[in-house]
Amino acid sequence: MRDVSITLQIENWAQRTFESQDGSSRVVRSGDVMDPTGRCRLTAWCDFDPTPGDSIRIEGGRVQFWQGSPDLVIDSLEQVSSLSDSPWEKIDPENHWVEVGLTEITQGGSRRGISTSGTIVAINSGSGIIERCPECRRMLRDGSCTEHGAQRGVEDLRLRFVLDDGVSNANLFLGKESAEEFLGMKMDKIKSEISSIGKEVFVSNLRRRVLARKMAVHGRCAVDGQGAMLFADKVELVESKPAEEAEMVMQKWEVVL
């Protein structure tokens, strides 16, 4: 998609230098941007260095996909300008999540900065300490990467659940930081606990804690031919209110007692 015009607020910004295929050094700048409808990544192939919190206007930008999510790209400074006044009240990045129903997520495209909820209906037995390929970060299976063969893996922490809203479901992944926050323990302590009680007991304890519980999720989603995946920045268990939930079901299905 080309000729994109949009107003955005900068959340963060960084640059990195890399070696291109012809051997020359190139600089790419990128960061997270947002507006009241959500957030995405912005990549600049030009000397553009905004400050977090700045409001900008893009004219003639383009969209590309990175890790399944649409990202904005500008190729020259002529495509972007700084705004002295924001068209909306300053957005707080820590609390900026767009509420989207789980079924809507599964039927839509990949996006960032979303908040959704559902019931945990399954816990993957591979949850806990895993090993990743040092080359591509894929999860190793029996010490082997599907892309790079046998590898000495790098340990990581991952929890994997299935979230369901009664109509649709999605795989939910908690990476190291979000898993540590949810479990209330650092990775080293979790590793020690698994070594002490065993992987099966660890997963069993996790099932007792979350299975059939409602969970609120904040993060990003990726949707492809294999279904929907949620990658959580943070999660929290939601205390159920049976009377209110029963009333909602009765209203939805027009039940009269």
Protein language model annotation of sequence segments:
Residues M1-L257:
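Single-stranded nucleic acid-binding proteins centered on OB/S1-type folds
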